[in-house]
Amino acid sequence: MAPSDTPPSAEDLPSQGELALFAPPATAEDALVPASMVNAWIYCPRLAVLEWGRGEKARSVDLIAGLRAHQATESGPTPALPDPMVLREDQSLKTRKLSLSSERLGLTAELDLLDVEEGVVIPVEIKVGKRPSVDEGAYLPERAQVCAQALLLREAGYTCLEGALWFAESRERVTVDLTEALVTATLVATSDLRLTVASGRLPPPLDHSAKCPRCSLLPICLPDEIAWFRKGSIARTPPPPASPALPLYGQTPGARIGKKDRGGSVCLDRMAAWLSSRPVPCYAAIGMLNTASGASHPSVARHADGGASARSFRLPTAFRRPVRRSLPCYAAR
């Protein structure tokens, strides 16, 4: 029987397993992967390649907040970290700003803070925000970044058994255990990033991910635009749920807003005569007030109290959020 000229389809080919290949040790000409880029690769491969491989940079609110959190730790001079051959087993100290590199690991890092407890060195990475509510105490990208720092310390000859993350907003410290699984994930991420950058390939953007809106490289990455060209459409964002609350606007010059009684009244009163006589008009929006429950129509019923200096807006129910008494209305042009 003559062989067919038609190439076999993908279904006819035998399945082949994937073999994980690590990148070779870095040389003097190769760029070393920063520990922060290990974090970025696990978080979003496209972000890591754009930043480290292609040099794309953009400032964001989160980035500026992170820089300020790091600067807050620089409150004064600290002793230098002794050489591992000189560091005593009973020695304890705190130090900052240590640079480490390893061609064998293909890694480099700028360590924020180092705790030395009885000769054991603990790298501490400072993060903005609160500690996440996860079993490990932190997400994998942050733990891998600390693990990369710990591996560099071990490579330099220091004893490092664990790492730590400091969350500035919640002021909590989380211990990072250097498990075999975490070390493997860190080395695989380092190798994959080096191989991807060396190949010149740019990973595809994340598919409709919640990570994208706050990313500093969103205008460069263009995930929605690329998804549209690939699929012809993008996933529609679900509309927000309808709220029964209505805004309340106060437009009386020199007025203030406050609760009149427990029944949910809002009183709009004039302040002192000298303030109300100012020429600047006052237009202020006073939050969202729940007026749906117990009301035949979601509107605010107005009741005049007979006085020329005050007006009351009677709500059928109490506030969804309590309004602070004597909340001032600020002038706006």
Curated annotation (Swiss-Prot):
Sequence positions that bind [4Fe-4S] cluster: C44, C212, C215, C221
UniProtKB keywords: 4Fe-4S, Antiviral defense, Exonuclease, Hydrolase, Iron, Iron-sulfur, Manganese, Metal-binding, Nuclease
UniProt catalytic activity: exonucleolytic cleavage in the 5'- to 3'-direction to yield nucleoside 3'-phosphates
Cofactor binding, per record: Mg(2+) or Mn(2+) required for ssDNA cleavage activity. Can also utilise Cu(2+).
Protein residues bound to Mn(2+): H70, D112, E125, I126
Enzyme Commission no: 3.1.12.1
GO MF: 4 iron, 4 sulfur cluster binding; manganese ion binding; single-stranded DNA 5'-3' DNA exonuclease activity
Signal peptide: none
Pfam short name (any one): Cas_Cas4
GO process annotations (BP): defense response to virus; DNA catabolic process
Cofactor annotation: Mg(2+); Mn(2+); Cu(2+); [4Fe-4S] cluster
Domain of life: Bacteria
UniProt function note: CRISPR (clustered regularly interspaced short palindromic repeat) is an adaptive immune system that provides protection against mobile genetic elements (viruses, transposable elements and conjugative plasmids). CRISPR clusters contain sequences complementary to antecedent mobile elements and target invading nucleic acids. CRISPR clusters are transcribed and processed into CRISPR RNA (crRNA). This may be a 5' to 3' ssDNA exonuclease.
Family listed: Belongs to the CRISPR-associated exonuclease Cas4 family.
NCBIfam families referenced in this protein's UniProt entry, alphabetically: cas4 (TIGR00372)
Full protein name: CRISPR-associated exonuclease Cas4
Lineage: Bacteria, Pseudomonadati, Pseudomonadota, Alphaproteobacteria, Rhodospirillales
